[in-house]
Amino acid sequence: MSLEEQRTRDELKHKLLDLNQLHEQLAELRTICPSLLKLLHPETGTSRKFEKSAQEAIEKVNSFYTHLKSSQNVFDYAEKSLQADSSNLLPTYLYNSEDLSNDTENNETKSINGKSALDLKEPHHSELHDNDNFQNSDINIESFKGDIEASGSILTTHENKSFTLKLANELEFIFFHDTRGKFSVYCSSSKDDAITFSINRNNNFLGNLWSLMPKILDYQHLYSKPCDFCKSLISPVYLELPSVRRNANSTVKPTSKDILALHAECVPAQSDL
């Protein structure tokens, strides 16, 4: 076989190899393409089921919004009624141990080391905080006017010792006396439902005015400082909402230094007040 014939034969072999590779690639594509198309266009039955479920979900959401809108006058009436007279608020708290003891034992006492349980129990809230009366106390809402004005917040007073505080970031809180004579605070803002829900769920705003007011004013700085426990930033990116607490070591009227901003999971047990 001449040299020319050998070279021609080798070229034909290379072309055959290239042709075989093309056939193999074509076979792979024939297998892959239907799978890809199936992902892009699911089977008719699956698509219809998804569409039906989605439509049902949309109808339920629309029905909820319609019902909520039709009930808006009820919510408006409840809020105005609460502002007009805080006694209209029905108690939603559980009876404490003192109440249960009085109800079930008819004020019977047990002797402990020569003293009765009534002698050993803690003084009533009204005995500890006589100065918390809204109009007659040394520490009343007037004591915080400077802090409120400096923070850019707006205070609106109502009848029967209740008032509304709107922070500079538009979060709104209602202060009122509950049926036990203590101050209760409720976040009534609708600007950011996530923040409102977190504040209402993670805090028990109940007690005296001098400890509650600095806490509430501190909520205008939701994301401006790190967690006082783990020192990491309270990040709005991850929707980390702070849990504001008063420093347990503070025994005087708290200032901004006495307020702790903590991640919910970083609240030490000893700081819960």
Curated annotation (Swiss-Prot):
GO terms for cellular component: mediator complex; nucleus. One of its GO terms (molecular function) is transcription coactivator activity. The keyword ATP-binding does not apply. GO terms for biological process: positive regulation of transcription initiation by RNA polymerase II. Pfam families: Med27. Transmembrane segments: none annotated. It is found in: Nucleus. Keywords: Activator, Nucleus, Transcription, Transcription regulation. Disulfide bonds: none annotated. The keyword Repeat does not apply. Component of the Mediator complex, a coactivator involved in the regulated transcription of nearly all RNA polymerase II-dependent genes. Mediator functions as a bridge to convey information from gene-specific regulatory proteins to the basal RNA polymerase II transcription machinery. Mediator is recruited to promoters by direct interactions with regulatory proteins and serves as a scaffold for the assembly of a functional preinitiation complex with RNA polymerase II and the general transcription factors. Belongs to the Mediator complex subunit 27 family. Component of the Mediator complex. This is Mediator of RNA polymerase II transcription subunit 27. It comes from Schizosaccharomyces pombe (strain 972 / ATCC 24843) (Fission yeast). The lineage of its organism: Eukaryota, Fungi, Dikarya, Ascomycota, Taphrinomycotina.
